[in-house]
Amino acid sequence: VVQAGETVNGGTLTNHDNQIVFGTANGMTISTGLEYGPDNEANTGGQWIQNGGIANNTTVTGGGLQRVNAGGSVSDTVISAGGGQSLQGQAVNTTLNGGEQWVHEGGIATVTVINEKGWQAVKSGAMATDTVVNTGAEGGPDAENGDTGQNVYGDAVRTTINKNGRQIVAAEGTANTTVVYAGGDQTVHGHALDTTLNGGYQYVHNGGTASGTVVNSDGWQIIKEGGLADFTTVNQKGKLQVNAGGTATHVTLKQGGALVTSTAATVLGSNRLGNFTVENGKADGVVLESGGRLDVLEGHSAQKTRVDDGGTLAVSAGGKATDVTMTSGGALIADSGATVEGTNASGKFSIDGISGQASGLLLENGGSFTVNAGGQAGNTTVGHRGTLTLAAGGSLSGRTQLSKGASMVLNGDVVSTGDIVNAGEIHFDNQTTQDAVLSRAVAKGDSPVTFHKLTTTNLTGQGGTINMRVRLDGSNTSDQLVINGGQATGKT
């Protein structure tokens, strides 16, 4: 027992030793006290800091326990793997090198550093301030591994989450003024206030709320079904993702920031063009850029959508998007069962979901359009990283232009009543077997291959390729390219 007014310097506690501190203990090494397991009230060994007691520069090793009761205080404790600190008083400058810190009701932990495999549990009625979290996310993004990093059931203030760090805010917990850097993340089941994502991620789960989050470059806020975000600001190269059933209100989307959502979510806020809304299956005034994406689902609609460089508008069959503005680098994903109308770099374009007729499409940068059976695409331009797919019974009209890096995929017999200009790749595909879905494929003799025919009035080669299949089994059947009434020119 170290009595009040006494000071003990150095020493080791082993083999069920017990030190009761009312005075001051400096430089102790503790390797006993956890005989009944971590954070177990049955433990009686180790170092106990009582009301008015102080411990400085303590080392807690495997199996060791430092217990800080109400009114006690410790500083500069280092806890290795297998050791723990049970805190009902105050602890400053604790380092968890694989060890654990359990902050109980009334306890306050200040400037705890949680290194690899370390764990801090902040319980209801407890507080942790200025914590640095360097572990917890090694299992991958949003993995619910709650045995490393920081778990918050009480209050955590001014936490810094670095690469590989994770803070899990439980349903009854609150995290305030957290900064998350690249490679770290915050999982929110309770309340997160004023989080800054400097390349890090924030996941807001069902029942969780996040207010005042700032998403900076490479940061990502994900609102899951039943989650709520309020007053999120998305700066350049930041991303806000709102899943179906999630809600984000009072969003400020700055230029260069990305919004990823669908018409099954609720998102309300402002962007560089004014106010926008996504609610009740309708989207209005959404701006998509820099990795942003809006999915318009079947039976839902969108109006006045702007798709800029890096943005994607995806319209499902039975969905409708009107007054769309597509600029250079924007991507449209749809099929002939969707209804879309607007303008792109070539002028007006449209898709009539009832007739299956499309006109003036520009597909680039990941954009794609599928012409279903009975549908037709007229005057289509497929740019770099764009794809035009035609099902059996789909057709082309007017001028179909494939630029370098573009693809046209034929899943059946297709007729073009106009011109095809090819600087990209034309693929004859086979939906019935994976064996034949190969560029420049030679079909195996026993493979169930269905060969296709492309018929066009004119074909102009501009250095593109046409990938056709042939069966080498004596029949020599193959895909076919038929020039009907016109000519083939150029180089393919």
Give the label of every model feature segment.
Residues 15, 34, 81-83, 115, ...:
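Short, solvent-exposed coil/turn segments at beta-strand boundaries
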Residues 35-43, 138-147, 436-443:
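Intrinsically disordered, low-complexity Ser/Thr- and acidic-rich flexible linkers and loops
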Residues 18, 27, 40, 144-146, ...:
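Intrinsic-disorder/low-complexity loop/linker signature
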Residues 136, 260-277, 345, 350:
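Phosphate/pyrophosphate-recognition segments in soluble nucleotide-handling domains
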Residues 10, 95, 268-271, 304, ...:
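Extracellular beta-solenoid/beta-roll
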Residues 16-18, 44, 81, 145-149, ...:
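Short, hydrophobic/aromatic-rich segments at coil-to-beta transitions
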Residues 2, 8-13, 19-21, 25-30, ...:
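Fold-core signature of tandem repeat domains
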Residues 222, 276-281, 295, 350, ...:
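Short, composition-biased local secondary-structure segments
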